[in-house]
């Protein structure tokens, strides 16, 4: 073990990125103690799609956490921070279970929904409300795509989450 309970506090960080999860340990001064990474696949199917399996994220979190806990005692960890990829679309049911693969920010199949949204609301007004432009990269357009193309999934959707929110 690299730390003991007599050592200064240790902080654990998980970054659920596009290509993998990076878990790190820092001391209270910000010095990096250790880092572990676990990759997961992205399915780049035809039609501008980019999807991931949320179960792969969870496995990566578990694997990297277990690897770091071989180096420090859980009692030494004073705090945990989680960051992750954004602008995706993960539809979950009322029990929090994924209903379909997660659509990543780079999934562009909702370009028609982007156009529809632009016709229904002034893009400047949309920006004033949300702080974002209308784009197939964002979550709302992806959810609109699910509603149109996978109505049975949309009907079961209790929440739409981003990757880190699911974890």
What spans do the regions from the language model cover?
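A short acidic Gly-Thr/Ser loop motif
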Residues: 15-19, 82-85
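Single conserved hydrophobic/aromatic residue that forms the stacking wall/gate
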Residues: 1-7, 11
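Glycine-rich phosphate-binding/catalytic subdomain of phosphoryl-transfer
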Residues: 62-167
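Short glycine-rich, Thr/Ser-proximal phosphate-binding strand/loop in the N-terminal lobe
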Residues: 16-54, 97-105
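Hydrophobic packing within well-folded, soluble alpha/beta domains
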Residues: 10, 23-25, 61
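N-terminal phosphate-binding loop and adjacent alpha-helix
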Residues: 36-74, 118
């Amino acid at each position: 073990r690299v730390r003991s309970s007599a050592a200064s506090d240790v902080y654990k960080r998980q970054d659920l990125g596009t290509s993998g999860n990076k878990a790190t340990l820092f001391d209270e001064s910000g010095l990096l103690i250790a880092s572990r990474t676990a990759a997961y696949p992205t399915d780049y199917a035809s039609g501008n799609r980019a999807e991931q399996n949320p179960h792969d994220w969870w496995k990566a979190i578990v694997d990297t956490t277990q690897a770091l806990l071989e180096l420090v005692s859980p009692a030494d960890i004073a705090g945990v921070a989680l960051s992750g990829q954004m602008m995706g679309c993960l539809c979950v049911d009322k029990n929090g279970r994924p209903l379909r693969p997660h659509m990543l920010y780079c999934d562009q199949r909702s370009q028609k929904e982007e156009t529809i949204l632009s016709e229904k609301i002034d893009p400047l007004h949309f920006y004033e409300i949300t702080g974002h432009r209308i784009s197939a990269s964002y979550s709302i357009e992806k959810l609109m795509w699910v509603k149109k193309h996978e109505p049975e999934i949309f009907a079961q959707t209790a929440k739409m989450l981003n990757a880190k929110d699911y974890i």
